[in-house]
Design a protein with these regions (language model features):
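PEST-like, low-complexity acidic/proline-rich intrinsically disordered segments
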Residues: 1-11
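Leucine-rich repeat
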Residues: 2, 18-201
Length: 201
């Protein structure tokens, strides 16, 4: 009798937990886009991806959030290997591909692990930047530990980009060779070596 009562109580608790979880998801899913985006803007890329797996509506929020922060230190895998680094980079590749042209206000990259095959990984980082510009990014924040950074010309030709911050580890930063007229209102260069004066013309 006691055992039956315990089983009944356990089943009741599980049912309540399931209902609570379902209601919590529904409440979040029913939020206005701007409210949900505001909440998600505080999440790391790893947590943002988890939210996107909860429901179809959450996936819509996840793919249209205007603030995207990809910080290697917050989502690096345990026992780092080159294979795991590539897998991590591929997750952002997929995200930006599925995101399409949803407008992006802020795109922040903090990437300090290039490991082997640096050229391939560097190309992927440049592709992320190009994708962010395609999404009409307004604020671009780059913190990279690479030997050399040549920013693509689309960064300086962008009509939406207003703020650009670049932090390197005393490595070379090169502006595109073509002339450009930028709409930048804010430029911050930290721990960089400038190849020439094109940045300031």
């Amino acid at each position: 009798m006691v055992r039956k009562r315990k089983l009944g109580a356990s089943a009741s608790c599980e049912a309540e937990d399931a209902n609570c979880a379902e209601n919590a998801i529904d409440r979040f899913s029913n939020l206005p886009d701007e409210v949900a985006h505001r909440i998600l803007s505080f999440l790391s890329f790893k947590d943002l991806t988890r939210v996107g797996a909860v429901s179809k509506r959450c996936r819509q929020f996840h793919l249209s959030v205007p603030v995207v922060s990809f910080d290697y230190s917050s989502c690096k895998p345990r026992g780092v290997t080159n294979q795991k680094i590539v897998k991590l980079m591929s997750s952002l590749d997929r995200y930006l591909r599925y995101r399409g042209d949803h407008r992006m206000q802020v795109f922040s990259i903090n990437w300090s692990c290039f490991g082997s095959e640096q050229a391939s990984k560097f190309f992927r980082v440049i592709t992320w930047i190009v994708n962010a510009v395609r999404c009409n990014v307004e604020v671009l924040d780059l913190r990279l530990a690479c030997d050399f950074l040549a920013l693509p010309s689309c960064v300086f030709l962008s009509k939406s980009l207003q703020s650009l911050s670049v932090h390197l580890t005393w490595m070379i930063l090169e502006a595109p060779s073509v002339s450009f007229s930028s709409n930048l209102c804010y430029l911050k260069l930290e721990k960089v070596t400038i190849v020439d004066e094109r940045f300031f013309k």
